């Protein structure tokens, strides 16, 4: 019988990544059978994030400090498989992992706190989570708050008893907030989710499943938003690392 409560670690350019075989492995790793949730910070790693780690010391420190770094991008998965031919690792997309965690939280009545997004998007996210999975949302805060309100927010998270805290503020803002909130409320699983609330509520269209399964979600985004071309060109440096064995 396969043990889903542990997972191997793989190293790419000095960064330790969890190797999950599939979504079920990820869920069983993070959520125990008795309903207990691991404490720590989840960070999705793709090629763009790998470049940010190299170029920005603050981002590097934030991401290296996170307990659970996993392969969100297909390019990162391919790099792991190239460097470790025996690795049984698959892409676990952050948006899909968030939905799976919310479904599991609803079934187990795990308290959830949502942070980030526009007020109307956050409200729609709450409504849909309750309707779809009966998620026990014990608090929320949109992304439009003042720096002086941060401490009060952290205390609200702590006092809510939340065991899962998801933060949709983009990188590195969400990683900074999760790090600081954990100093006040350490006993929870924190997950940075970027634009996931927008996708979940239908405000942003995600690539069709066939594109995702082919590892071409990046191409779909580029065709949908040609302005992303500059960001995509920067990823050529990652490809150079991959093909020259510098991972």
From Swiss-Prot:
Coiled-coil regions listed in the entry: none
Keywords: Glycosyltransferase, Transferase
EC number: 2.4.1.180
Gene Ontology terms, MF aspect: lipopolysaccharide N-acetylmannosaminouronosyltransferase activity
Pathway(s) served: Bacterial outer membrane biogenesis; enterobacterial common antigen biosynthesis
GO annotation, biological process: enterobacterial common antigen biosynthetic process
Record family assignment: Belongs to the glycosyltransferase 26 family.
Protein role: Catalyzes the synthesis of Und-PP-GlcNAc-ManNAcA (Lipid II), the second lipid-linked intermediate involved in enterobacterial common antigen (ECA) synthesis.
Protein name in the entry: UDP-N-acetyl-D-mannosaminuronic acid transferase
Record organism: Enterobacter sp. (strain 638)
